[in-house]
Curated annotation (Swiss-Prot):
Molecular-function GO terms, alphabetical: structural constituent of cuticle
Protein name: Cuticle protein 9
Native source organism of the sequence: Blaberus craniifer (Death's head cockroach)
This protein's UniProt keywords: Cuticle, Repeat
């Protein structure tokens, strides 16, 4: 699923950071790029 980054940015930033310098995060049920 693709969801608005603003709704999950904080949660993903603390739980699923792929790279600290890239604004791309992954979640088991969604991928957010912003």
């Amino acid at each position: 699923a693709v969801v608005p980054a603003s709704t999950v940015k904080t949660a993903l930033a603390y739980t699923y950071p792929i790279h600290p310098y890239h604004s791309v995060y992954a979640h088991p049920h969604s991928v957010v790029i912003y």
